[in-house]
Amino acid sequence: MAQTFTGRKRIRKFFGKIKEVAEMPNLIEVQKASYDQFLQIEEPKGGRDDDGLQAVFKSVFPISDFSGASMLEFVRYEFEPPKYDVDECRQRGMTFAAPLKVTLRLIVFDVDPETGAKSVKDIKEQDVYTGDIPLMTMNGTFIVNGTERVIVSQMHRSPGVFFDHDKGKTHSSGKLLFAARIIPYRGSWLDIEFDAKDIVFARIDRRRKIPVTSLLYALGLDNEEILSTFYEKIPFTREKGGWRMPFDPKRMKGYKAVADLIDADTGEVVLEAGKKLTVRAGRQLAEKGLKALKISDEEMIGQYIAEDLVDLTSGEIHAEAGEEITEKTLKLLEETGYNEIPVLDIDHVNTGAYIRNTLTADKNVTREDALFDIYRVMRPGEPPTLDSAQAMFHSLFFDSERYDLSAVGRVKMNMRLDLDCPDTVRVLRRDDILSVIRTLVELRDGKGEIDDIDHLGNRRVRSVGELMENQYRVGLLRMERAIKERMSSVDIDTVMPQDLINAKPVAAAVREFFGSSQLSQFMDQTNPLSEITHKRRLSALGPGGLTRERAGFEVRDVHPTHYGRICPIETPEGPNIGLINSLATFARVNKYGFIEAPYRRVVDSKVTDEVVYLSAMEEGKYYVAQANIPLDKDGRFEEDLIVCRHAGDVLLVAPDRVDFMDVSPKQLVSVAAALIPFLENDDANRALMGSNMQRQAVPLVRSQAPLVGTGMEAVVARDSGAAIAARRTGVIDQVDATRIVIRATEEADPSKSGVDIYRLMKFQRSNQSTCINQRPLVRVGDQVKKGDIIADGPSTELGELALGRNVLVAFMPWNGYNFEDSILLSENIAKEDVFTSIHIEEFEAMARDTKLGPEEITRDIPNVSEEALKNLDEAGIVYIGAEVRAGDILVGKITPKGESPMTPEEKLLRAIFGEKAADVRDTSLRLPPGTTGTIVEVRVFNRHGVDKDERALAIEREEIERLAKDRDDEQAILDRNVYGRLIEILDGKTAIAGPKGFRKETVVTREILTEYPRSQWWLFAVADDAIMAELEAIRAQYDDSKKRLEQRFLDKVEKLQRGDELPPGVMKMVKVFVAVKRKIQPGDKMAGRHGNKGVVSRIVPVEDMPFLEDGTNVDIVLNPLGVPSRMNVGQILETHLGWACAGLGRQVAAAMEAYYGKQDLKPLRDRLETIYGKDEIEQLKDGELPELGENLRKGVPMATPVFDGAHEADIEQQLEKAGLDASGQSTLYDGRTGEPFDRKVTVGYIYMLKLHHLVDDKIHARSIGPYSLVTQQPLGGKAQFGGQRFGEMEVWALEAYGAAYTLQEMLTVKSDDVAGRTKVYEAIVRGEDTFESGIPESFNVLVKEMRSLGLNVDLENS
């Protein structure tokens, strides 16, 4: 536990009892693995896998022209390095992407006009640029136009075949109508369904239905083949007085005898009329030797003939296959001498006559008719020809260009239909369609089960890579059409591949996907947890998915297969509930896109440490025990009956039947839910709110990790990328607020730099305007291992997620101020900036080139006082550090005005001063209302070729200095490493040559070396060739590293000095970042982790707050009535355990005081050992204990993992250890009277978050502002600086009070009476208090509208 660099500084006491054998996978692996598989950036030796981009190119190429005289082949692709790195893209508003270069080969053929034989005439190969492909950042996001976006994974129905019924809803009788649907990955859907009359129909792409036999005719089957495919034949032989039928007990089980059943050989009655033939009786009769039964003519009537009965001499058909036998038929057959008739095995009990009835009902009788019918359904209005109908039918299901089941679809189909077909066959086969129809008919006969479409074996995940692959294929197919046309229109002998390719459609498809797809979302960057959750989200919405309106209850519901795969708790409240889910903590997505959960294998009742990942389909076959089943020390089950999950049910089974066991109790829930301590004590609805609200917690100025955590905090901080982890093991060389330099000590590869420089983000703006700020945790000389946390980010503390603060809470009412979930706070909280957060707002000003002339960014603004310009520099841009308020100028800008006719005075001025006086207007960027803050950053962007102003040059110089310092530091460490290595090699060796003044054959020592400048050390030579070769290698490596370092520096400087790519018409752009400090205030929303949310109602002076016996004031008072009805008792347990944490912290603080007094570490070590146990503390060195003690003063942090955490007894034990009352309650005194309250009160530490719903962002008041163009009424909404709507009901209220004048004002001068508004202003200026109301503009609009309808309305004076 405590072996990491930060883990040793503050150890969490862990309550979990279950050993975790599997490491939790990286939390953003879903995104990274999928996109890496799509790109396959590095080409391996044997070539790339047929996956992702490679698969797309292979499926579209080769492209041949229409005549077949030339062909364009795909050879390979490679990525060039991206033009800008991640930070540059963020700042410049660019997309972080790499150019894709594809090598194409154009082959031109000579075609012999007579034979049509082809011979290669010419082959040309060329690299062609085919647009940029966005790259994923280290944290699993994309940067598109300067903003971070996430591609959410989509859950959709897996390709394959599904059997279902309508649940009796279609027909009034409630009859179940069965249906099968074959869903491909790409191509036409095929539905096969029963109607109410039990006729089987097929539908293609949900169009008009056709009898399924027409589909079978189109597949090349005839009547007889269709019947023989779906039915067995029974040969009936004529005998004296009836017919002989072979006896088959399996076939005849459940047969109810209409007449006596008679043995054909002996004449005995084997079953009396009216009785049923049971399975047992049938088997006994067969054993007794019953071979055949005698059947009367009456019983033959109603059977169906299995084959065409044809007179071989004349060719006359006496009876057709499928024809029902009647008395007439029997007579005819008797006359024509048929003694043996093959009959279809249809008994209407076990086997129904559905296919035979469909044949009879089908109007089509030949393949041609069927093909024409299908053609008319698919392309109504077009006259069919046999060739076109055949080609169209083939292209529907059997053409790999148009139809793709995908490997997943084929695997699913094989499993469902018990077929054995390789997953490379991705089109339908005849056997597939026949198997589907056969299975459907069996379902109608009562054999088999329908599928559950909400089972996770039938739903799969499309991650980034796959979504991008589909989009890229769309772009390439658009390009293919253009290439084909161009190949036939140009002189193919002279063109190169480059001339045929236009990469625009591909680039547009990619851009469209990242810019406007429903699954490409603006990343929720409120805090690290919200980032991680966003990347692990699964959405059922989006293209090809469900829509909110159509999704029913079943799709949204929790399914047994969600266990360990999808979190049953975390989903949004509202219309998207259940459609947007979160991946469970240990879940992963396999190569087919199915979600897998990990399990420990159980062998002979012994649980092993082998971890197996199972998909939902595989898991259904096994018995799976839960993670909290008690085991003995050998890993065997202690109990005789084990609770197991099997095929969606929960059962009790013997230990020897258990196959697998859960890996961890928290594999059930998502990351956010796994961060809630005592989750098992909360109601699910509140847990849902708790996990959703943690994502809205604003990063605080000084956040704290929770005293009561779950052990997941460090994992989230590490995987989110908010905290910086060391890339390599090494020693800290330099640290300051903006960067950390680490000298790598274990780098074996000499070609890699021995230095890692980590740039820390300082006061950067996130997507949600929260503040991203990183702080170093290391000091110079510290040794860190790979993966250790070296800097905290937003909402992290000592490498652990810290979304809020631990505050002292009392659960009690307080003068009604915590009525209905309101929260009462102490003034201390506001004063000490406990819940203060910094928000960074971004404002931008653009200087455009207008028709009247260019706009200008300047300090010289007309009609503006010097006072208003006090924060601007000479370039007209605000200083960094300036305090600004609403209305202050951030960037001075003037825009040319249209030429207006000049007055004689202006002409005179122009003649005297020779300049335009004031033909510009002020369009400066001002701070909007409701904002005050400090300028933290200014960025200036200039178009290429535009002269940079002083401010832009100053920013550029500063940036170059920063880059130069990085280069110099890296160079210094490189020098130190290389020359240190030289000293080690040369020290003690005899030199045969050296610099000027050095005597040969002298032993080189460190002292001698220090007499010469370092650059001359290379001149020393020794006799040993091996050493000289090593020196040469080091020298070459050193020179190469220096050159690379310098080149990197020059490239970056060149990028800086080069102009920026700005939108068309923009000459210059200035971005200003304002940091706004938001203290907590009444109206802000706060919440705990258990769904206990509320709004701050009042901030009370410290002296009025309730206080404990030692005089400590509580920080926050919550209403106890908010707990019982909500059933989120977890918050009370957290409070008790938090109280114990703080008590133990006070004990550690006392031990620390003793250490500072006597320098004796023993009391501290003893105290820590009683808290954590000996094993944990023994690993720590003496030097590490004081720092640990200091970090524990405020409280000893504890981890209580979900479903495996502290129990009531554990909490009581900790309270007793801390010397506190085991009830967790304390006597509180009223701050206003000093009297104790009548009863003891639950007091403790609870973790509270400040949420992103801040009152400052919501409250708003309008003075004078913009009006709507047509109605002249004030606009609405805070963003438009709008007014409050005085609506219908408000008008009723004034009418009810008879406030006539107020009402008239509201409807006229305070709204849209334009002339009246001006008159009111004038009257106020003159000091009068009377004015007249005119006609509201909206009335004029109504009049105009009526006139437009031809009704003339005139207003008469009355």
Swiss-Prot record:
* Matches recorded under SUPFAM superfamilies: beta and beta-prime subunits of DNA dependent RNA-polymerase (SSF64484)
What Pfam families does the record point to?
RNA_pol_Rpb2_1, RNA_pol_Rpb2_2, RNA_pol_Rpb2_3, RNA_pol_Rpb2_45, RNA_pol_Rpb2_6, RNA_pol_Rpb2_7
The question of whether Ribonucleoprotein is a record keyword is answered with: no
Which keywords label this protein? DNA-directed RNA polymerase, Nucleotidyltransferase, Transcription, Transferase
Reaction equations catalysed: RNA(n) + a ribonucleoside 5'-triphosphate = RNA(n+1) + diphosphate
- Gene Ontology BP terms: DNA-templated transcription
Q: What class of enzyme is it?
A: transferase
Q: Where are the transmembrane segments?
A: none
- Among its keywords, does the record have Plastid? no
GO MF entries: DNA binding; DNA-directed RNA polymerase activity; ribonucleoside binding
Protein EC: 2.7.7.6
Function comment: DNA-dependent RNA polymerase catalyzes the transcription of DNA into RNA using the four ribonucleoside triphosphates as substrates.
Family from the record: Belongs to the RNA polymerase beta chain family.
NCBIfam families listed in its UniProt record: PRK00405.1, rpoB
Report what the protein is called. Answer: DNA-directed RNA polymerase subunit beta
Source organism (scientific name): Xanthobacter autotrophicus (strain ATCC BAA-1158 / Py2)
